Amino acid sequence: MDHVKLVNDPIDIAHIHQLLADEGCGASSVFVGTTRDNFQGKKVLSLAYEAYDSMALKEMNKICSDLRSKWLDLKHIVIYHRLGTVPVCEASVVIAASSPHRSEALESVSFAIDQLKTRVPIWKKEIYDGDNDSEWKENKESIRPKKSKSGFNYAACPCKVEESHDVPRTLVQIRVNDAELTKRLECFVNRKRDEINSQNVIDFKSSFVSSDQNLSDSCARTQSTIIKQEQSNCHLKVRRVNNRCGPQQMEMRPNYELELNKLMGSRDGQTDPTKEMRKSLPNSRLQAIESYMGLTTDNEENIFSRIKRVENRLLQLESISPEYRHFTKREPSSMEAAPPKKSRKKSYSAQELSAFIQKIKDGSELS
């Protein structure tokens, strides 16, 4: 039978022996943990125990189940733990077990006390004599090593790593001491805080303040105002912008593309790139393109670099402006032959077909 209990009164050891009594058992093992009077040179007056009762009892019952699954011959198991203040020389925990043979009883009690210290949520506080402050103590059994998230055993794969404290200067972005770096961080935080405060004053603080009030003591928290905007759930002003021109109005303006073509045609007539061409044909053609694209011309620069700049400019314009497709439309040159026009087939009525057939018959008879 399992006897598990948390008590606030002194534990009666004689009562524990009565719970272990059994005619079929030849051995009983009892562990009694008491309060000692010193710790690292400091005099201990008492120990104070606290526990999460429901969870502690649940874990103590699990320990009993583990003992019975490990040692099948156990008859009775007793786990008593005291809560509250426990003076020196008084029992704080008692773990006992009875079995037909001594090996099961001794081993099970040793295993149980280790599991109790590791798993059961019971906390101990040592109260010292004199001016020494009391301390909460942690059981060394409860300190669990940190497990790696990965299942790889790094200890089985030793490797030598040469540690070097010399970092190349090319990899260091900020070359200042700790004091200067801390100063920069503080200045950055203060500046962002001032920006937030000023924005809060603009958004939340009432602009109508009487003259008798001290403006230095006013703030958005004490003199805030909430003005609900019309047809809105927010007190902040919301503005809607209607773009009268641009790519967003293409659907609302059916003649937008025609107007754009006229505008770009008038613009093209204002400038004549051929006036700025030089004697060198490749250079003059590239210079005309650069002038048309709004790029600065550098004749001493490599021609491939200039072509690359023109390509980058084209990609940029195509990405930011939908109207740029106007430039990408290829118009047929005057030197090229015009594509043949598709001829539309004439449709005939039934009377016309009958007259045409009759004319063919008359011609065949005459021949």
UniProtKB/Swiss-Prot annotation:
It catalyses: 2 [molybdopterin-synthase sulfur-carrier protein]-C-terminal-Gly-aminoethanethioate + cyclic pyranopterin phosphate + H2O = molybdopterin + 2 [molybdopterin-synthase sulfur-carrier protein]-C-terminal Gly-Gly + 2 H(+). Substrate binds at residues 101-102, 117, 124-126. InterPro entries: MoaE_sf (IPR036563), MOCS2B_euk (IPR028888), Mopterin_biosynth_MoaE (IPR003448). One of its GO terms (cellular component) is ATAC complex. Residues 325-350 are annotated as: Disordered. The keyword Transferase applies. It holds the Pfam family MoaE. Its EC number is 2.8.1.12. It is found in: Cytoplasm; Nucleus. Catalytic subunit of the molybdopterin synthase complex, a complex that catalyzes the conversion of precursor Z into molybdopterin. Acts by mediating the incorporation of 2 sulfur atoms from thiocarboxylated Mocs2A into precursor Z to generate a dithiolene group. Involved during biosynthesis of the molybdenum cofactor. Heterotetramer; composed of 2 small (Mocs2A) and 2 large (Mocs2B) subunits. Component of the Ada2a-containing (ATAC) complex composed of at least Ada2a, Atac1, Hcf, Ada3, Gcn5, Mocs2B, Charac-14, Atac3, Atac2, NC2beta and wds. This is Molybdopterin synthase catalytic subunit. The gene is Mocs2B.
